[in-house]
Design a protein with these regions (language model features):
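Short secondary-structure boundary/capping segments
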Residues: 2-12, 123-126, 172-175
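Interdomain helical connector at the RecA1-RecA2 junction of SF1/SF2 helicase-like NTPases
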Residues: 2-103
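Conserved RecA-like P-loop NTPase helicase motor core
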Residues: 130-179
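Residue-level preference for the first positions of well-ordered beta-strands
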Residues: 105-107, 155
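Well-ordered alpha-helical segments embedded in enzymatic catalytic cores
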Residues: 82-92, 115, 143-144, 161
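Conserved helicase motor "Helicase C" RecA-like lobe of SF1/SF2 P-loop NTPases
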Residues: 110-135
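Short glycine-/polar-rich loops that comprise or flank the Walker A/P-loop
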Residues: 17-19, 32-36, 127-130, 169-173
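Conserved nucleotide-binding/hydrolysis micro-motifs of P-loop NTPases
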Residues: 2-5, 42-47, 113-115, 138-139, ...
């Protein structure tokens, strides 16, 4: 590639050499990005199969593909115990952040529209505030992204509709509730 400088590595392969590097720590120091923390949650999932046999699995431990799928389906069930606890913890975190950043917002990414609506109901119950819900088949949902981005409401719930390339700088807490 023209204008690219290459250097040989220890194995004799040529690697491109950057003229300038700018990483996350530089951007954080410059104040152009916010700090990112990933909170890990664990828990035990219990379910019954079609034959009525009860199963249990601990999230985060080695499982078969089928056990993993069933455990996540159980854990992400809005009517279960785990998601309400995760959402409540996320809201506690967001409320703490809003003491210093009053317009900080949170987002829940759901696996489907049914789950998104159910998570929105949970948020309404937990916070007393109706979240912004964005579903691809709802008229005006794209406008809601802009409204949420420019507003001060606390929570946004979407089904993979808000992703890379969508800029909502005030988002500070996220719950990725999909497998």
């Amino acid at each position: 590639i023209p204008f690219v400088t290459y250097e040989e590595d220890r194995a004799g392969f040529k690697q491109s050499r950057a003229d300038h590097t700018y990483g996350y720590s530089d951007a954080l120091a410059d104040g152009v990005v916010r700090p990112v923390m990933f909170m890990a949650y664990s828990g035990e999932a219990r379910w019954r199969d079609s034959a009525g046999e009860e199963h249990a699995a601990r999230l985060g431990e080695p499982l078969t593909a089928e056990q993993t799928a069933r455990a996540w389906k159980t854990a992400l069930n809005p009517a279960g115990e785990w998601m309400p606890a995760v959402i409540a913890a996320a809201d506690t975190r967001l409320r703490g952040l809003r003491e210093h950043v009053p317009d900080a917002g949170g987002m829940i990414i759901a696996s489907d529209q049914t789950a998104a609506r159910a998570y929105a109901d949970l948020l309404r119950t937990i916070t007393g505030e109706a979240p912004t819900v964005m579903l691809s088949d709802d008229k005006g949902s794209s406008d809601r992204i802009s409204q949420f981005s420019a507003g001060t409401s606390s929570w946004l719930v979407a089904v993979r509709m808000v992703s890379e390339g969508v800029d909502v700088p005030r988002l500070a807490v996220g719950v990725y509730a999909t497998s």
